[in-house]
Amino acid sequence: MKLDGYTRLAAVVANPIKHSISPFIHNRAFEATATNGAYVAWEIEASDLAETVANIRRYQMFGINLSMPYKEQVIPYLDKLSDEARLIGAVNTVVNENGNLIGYNTDGKGFFKCLPSFTISGKKMTLLGAGGAAKSILAQAILDGVSQISVFVRSVSMEKTRPYLDKLQEQTGFKVDLCALEYVSELQARIAESDLLVNATSVGMDGQSSPVPENIVLPETLLVADIIYQPFETPFLKWARSQGNPAVNGLGMLLYQAAEAFQLWTGKEMPTEEIWQSLTEKYQ
C-alpha cells in the first residue's frame, strides 16, 4: 500500500469496532483499484462523535462508515440524507462531497446485490426481525418495487415495531404486514406465498438455534437468506438447504454494502469477486 502526502483516509466509526473486517475489505479494494487511500477503524466515545465528523472535512477524507451505536446519532451533523437513509432513519456511510457531508445507508442495497440472480421488484418477501438490518432491507425493498412484505417479530416486540412501520407507510404509501412469530400457521401461510425469506434477527449466531420451527415447509422456488455470517452456515440455512432451497449467508451483504460505499467515495467499482475469494477463505 502506498502512503504519502496525497493519501486520503476513510474509517469505520463505532464502539466496539476493533474486530471489524471492513479495513480488510476496503484496503484490499484501494490496492486493487490503484486508489491512494487507507482505511482504519476508530473506536470512539459518544462525546467525540461531533469532532470525528468535523474531521472528515478538516482532513479531506473520503468519508466514514458507521456502525452501532452511531448510525442514528450521526444524522444531526450531516448536510443531507439520501432517500433510503431518510426512510431507515439511520446512516452507515458518510460521503464527503467537497465539504458537503451526505449520509447514505448502503446495507439494503448491499443485501439485494448479494442475492444470486434475484430482483425484488414485483416479488413477495417474508422478513424475520425488525432491528437495524431489517429496517434497511425493508426500506430498500420498497424503493426497489417489492409487491408485498410480511414482517414477523416476537409478540412482545409488536408494539415497539408498529410505529416504525406506520411511519414508513406515511412516507411511501406502502403497507407492511406485521405478524407475531409465535403464530406458526400464519408464518407458514406467508412463507408459502413468498419469493424470499430473510432472517434479520441474531438467532443462529450461537450455531444451534433457528428463528423458525423445523416443521415449516418451504416452497421449492423460495430463496432463503440470513444476515449472519459467523457461523458461515447457521442452523436456519442448513435447514433450508436440507429442503432443497437456495440459501445465502450474510457475508455477501457485508461485502456488497462495502462495495456501494467504496463506489460512492471513489467513483470506482470494488473488485468484489477477488475480495469475496479472500473473505470466504478467511471465514469459511
Swiss-Prot record:
Keywords: Amino-acid biosynthesis, Aromatic amino acid biosynthesis, NADP, Oxidoreductase
Top EC group: oxidoreductase
Positions contributing to shikimate binding: 20-22, 67, 92, 107, 229
Catalytic residue positions: 71 (proton acceptor)
BP GO annotations: amino acid biosynthetic process; aromatic amino acid family biosynthetic process; chorismate biosynthetic process; shikimate metabolic process
SUPFAM superfamilies recorded: Aminoacid dehydrogenase-like, N-terminal domain (SSF53223), NAD(P)-binding Rossmann-fold domains (SSF51735)
Pathway(s) the chain acts in: Metabolic intermediate biosynthesis; chorismate biosynthesis; chorismate from D-erythrose 4-phosphate and phosphoenolpyruvate: step 4/7
Known EC number: 1.1.1.25
Entry binding sites for NADP(+): 83, 129-133, 227, 250
Catalysed reaction, written as an equation: shikimate + NADP(+) = 3-dehydroshikimate + NADPH + H(+)
Entries under PANTHER family matching the protein: BIFUNCTIONAL 3-DEHYDROQUINATE DEHYDRATASE_SHIKIMATE DEHYDROGENASE, CHLOROPLASTIC (PTHR21089:SF1), SHIKIMATE DEHYDROGENASE (PTHR21089)
Family named by the database record: Belongs to the shikimate dehydrogenase family.
Subunit structure, as described in the record: Homodimer.
NCBIfam families, sorted: aroE, PRK00258.2-4
Function: Involved in the biosynthesis of the chorismate, which leads to the biosynthesis of aromatic amino acids. Catalyzes the reversible NADPH linked reduction of 3-dehydroshikimate (DHSA) to yield shikimate (SA).
Record-given protein name: Shikimate dehydrogenase (NADP(+))
Lineage: Bacteria, Bacillati, Bacillota, Bacilli, Lactobacillales
